[in-house]
């Protein structure tokens, strides 16, 4: 995994090779991590944050290929799914993870955008986040038009919706929770 992270960070390596390494080696290992021994360590998570997640924040155009973006987002989602406890102690690393996903939301490619929503939904499920961010992501998911990537949107909603009662607490016991109001308003629009 460490070598693949270094491979992805290396600008001299062709994009196809990076994508293939993630698709064939790293992501399957992370999928199996739930049923086998832990693959990710605190050092690997830190390397991922420094060499992959922070590169997007610096405006580096290293991830120009949509297939590579999807594989990186999938890898990041799997890390959050199976190794969120390794990020919990490092607030900077947590911020790097959500900023990484957030940076792909404005892109045109539907699959990349939906994979980014999936990553952010997993993040919001696992960690406390400002109410404004949770609301933006939830409403953004509800407003996405039906198209080819709808399966990813459903997965993101399946992850986020059960966490909403905890992440968006009700202010008043007599009125419906805020996230119910968001849903109603979005459906009426």
PLM regions: where:
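Flexible loop/turn segments at the boundaries of HEAT repeats in alpha-solenoid HEAT proteins
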Residues: 1, 30-46, 83-94, 124-135, ...
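Short, intrinsically disordered, charge-balanced linker/junction segments flanking boundaries
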Residues: 1, 25, 48-58, 76, ...
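Short linear interaction motifs
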Residues: 2-4, 94-101
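Alpha-helical recognition domains of nuclear gene-regulatory proteins
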Residues: 3, 7, 28, 55, ...
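Short coil/turn segments at helix-helix junctions and helix-capping linkers
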Residues: 7-19, 35-43, 55-70, 88, ...
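HEAT-repeat alpha-solenoid elements in large eukaryotic scaffold proteins
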Residues: 16-28, 52, 64-83, 97, ...
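C-terminal, active-site-flanking charged/polar segments
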Residues: 113, 121-126
